[in-house]
UniProtKB/Swiss-Prot annotation:
This protein's encoding gene: tsaC
Top-level taxon of the source organism: Bacteria
NCBIfam families listed in its UniProt record: L-threonylcarbamoyladenylate synthase (TIGR00057)
Similarity comment: family membership: Belongs to the SUA5 family. TsaC subfamily.
Reaction(s) catalysed (UniProt annotation): L-threonine + hydrogencarbonate + ATP = L-threonylcarbamoyladenylate + diphosphate + H2O
Keyword RNA-binding: no
Function per UniProt: Required for the formation of a threonylcarbamoyl group on adenosine at position 37 (t(6)A37) in tRNAs that read codons beginning with adenine. Catalyzes the conversion of L-threonine, HCO(3)(-)/CO(2) and ATP to give threonylcarbamoyl-AMP (TC-AMP) as the acyladenylate intermediate, with the release of diphosphate.
Species assigned in the record: Shewanella halifaxensis (strain HAW-EB4)
Protein known as: Threonylcarbamoyl-AMP synthase
Pfam families associated with the record: Sua5_yciO_yrdC (PF01300)
């Protein structure tokens, strides 16, 4: 498993690699959201059913526009979303037509977040798009809180480990439905 800096990860991701990287609260596993083979590999590693869908984490809102259909949201709904970003809030938003079901699962929406974590922002800047994100843990194990824990669980399984520090969030992000405003998970 290669250890890389956030700015140097682009080649691994562009080649379809699954990587681990520090986020606000735990290490995440991620890949290119436009590469179905990479997404399938990520789902296999996690033993996660595709029907559940995945989260996209972006460095800025513009990176999310190819994936979400903001025309289905009112100006007030969008203003509320923007008031929470960047930060530890994940929003369920309508998907653009034609988006891979591997990302949206069995839903007509997708979970998205604009991060405030400098390392994740650098990673997204390096690949010039959001990254698929799910917690770095095997089924039944706690999410990895260190690079050593990532190596223990994923050595020989993933393409690389991004070097960096976890953020200061003690819990996962709050999840809110952008259309209804309903809090789905309190972070």
């Amino acid at each position: 498993m290669l250890e890389v800096l956030p700015a140097d990860v682009a080649e691994l991701v562009e080649q379809g690699g699954v990587i681990a990287y520090p986020t606000e609260a735990v290490y995440g596993l991620g890949c290119d959201p436009d590469n179905d083979d990479a997404i399938e590999r990520l789902l296999e590693i996690k033993l996660r059913p595709w029907q559940k869908g995945l989260i996209l984490v972006a460095g800025d809102y513009q990176q999310l526009l190819p994936y979400i259909d903001e025309s289905q949201l009112s100006a007030e709904q969008l203003a509320f979303v923007h008031s929470k970003w960047p930060g530890p809030f994940t929003f369920i938003m309508p998907v653009k037509p034609g988006l891979s079901n591997l990302l949206s699962g069995s839903f007509d929406s997708i979970a998205v977040r604009v991060t405030a974590h400098e390392g994740v922002k650098a990673l997204c800047a390096a690949i010039n798009k959001p990254i698929v994100s799910t917690s770095a843990n095997l089924t039944g194990q706690d999410p990895a809180l260190s690079g050593a824990a990532v190596k223990q669980q994923f050595e020989g399984i993933i393409a690389g480990l991004v070097i960096g520090d976890l953020g200061i969030q003690a819990s996962p992000s709050t999840i809110i439905d952008a259309k209804s405003g309903q809090v789905i998970r309190k972070g």
